[in-house]
Amino acid sequence: MSWQEKINAALDARRTADALRRRYPVAQGAGRWLVADDRQYLNFSSNDYLGLSHHPQIIRAWQQGAEKFGVGSGGSGHVSGYSVVHQALEEELAEWLGYSRALLFISGFAANQAVIAAMMAKEDRIVADRLSHASLLEAASLSPSQLRRFTHNDVAHLARLLASPCPGQQLVVTEGVFSMDGDSAPLAEIQQVTQQHNGWLMVDDAHGTGVIGEQGRGSCWLQKVKPELLVVTFGKGFGVSGAAVLCSSTVADYLLQFARHLIYSTSMPPAQAQALRASLAVIRRDEGDARREKLVSLIARFRAGVQDLPFTLADSCSAIQPLIVGDNSRALQLAEKLRQQGCWVTAIRPPTVPAGTARLRLTLTAAHEMQDIDRLLEVLHGNG
């Protein structure tokens, strides 16, 4: 089989399964409204949970940062790309979340890959929730360590896997809020079992940070858990992009020596770090509380209105509200129907989610209004 035949076969298989991904160029895609092909849609696909991507203070901070520092960092943080603004953001994140240190990364994907690649050796074992994000599971699969997966949120299964002999160290990996189901991990129970077996815990809280807990401190703070490794990302609650790893001073020093994704990547622009500092300030103050409270009200309104629909509604109290329809083609048809009625919704299909669980991944944000939720419910009930 030639290269071209191999590529064609893979694409044909995706097409046949109604699983071929495609991108839609949008003129605006992160706020309450999505604009594509000169048409405006209510946007139920954005991860901008607090509606901060268009916040005037955050925009102004980025503009001022660009004027002062330029539009790029100029290099890796190990060379010339680590600015006083990066340092200030790391210190503010560490203080906010109760850690000694924070290290910035270009993306959550890079942060997860970097930590696992740097920390794990052949004699070690990773025990991961089987619904963990692709960045975590891919890094675990590519690492020299053994990978074992426990049934989603099943602490008893996790305990059994941890109890089996391991010559090295054990790292338990999970998410705070799961990206495709919107449910939360029982972090306190997971940490207890992990500590009983002398393991370390790594939590990716991409979808909880900024959105839940006191001052938006996220899933771990809410459940009174402090994992050895906490990954937070800035493309969701913060409304920007990038990520950070929160850890001890010793682990931070170790990652600065051995995390290749950090060492060999150009660091985020200082202007972006400036915008993230402004976003963090909004998240921590009363305005952040008001946005989180509004989001909770919107979620409650939506869940109350979909109980009688012929779909499986995931057990989620988060901004992620999946309607599981099962069949790929049906999910695509429903997403298209919603778009025709002015609601932009994304159909998520395998391999992103398990086979037979294709879904509409609906996301609600503080930028929405109650009438937006009512309109979505109207269309879902076939009255659009």
From Swiss-Prot:
Question: Which superkingdom, per the lineage?
Answer: Bacteria
Q: Which residues are involved in binding pyridoxal 5'-phosphate?
A: G108, F109, S179, H207, T233
Gene Ontology terms: biological process: biotin biosynthetic process
Pathway(s) it belongs to: Cofactor biosynthesis; biotin biosynthesis
Which Enzyme Commission number(s) are on file for it?
Answer: 2.3.1.47
What keywords are annotated for this sequence in UniProt? Biotin biosynthesis, Pyridoxal phosphate, Transferase
- The answer to whether UniProt assigns keyword Transferase to this entry is yes
- Is this entry keyworded Acyltransferase? no
The UniProt similarity line reads: Belongs to the class-II pyridoxal-phosphate-dependent aminotransferase family. BioF subfamily.
Name of the molecule in the record:
8-amino-7-oxononanoate synthase
Q: Which organism is it from?
A: Shigella sonnei (strain Ss046)
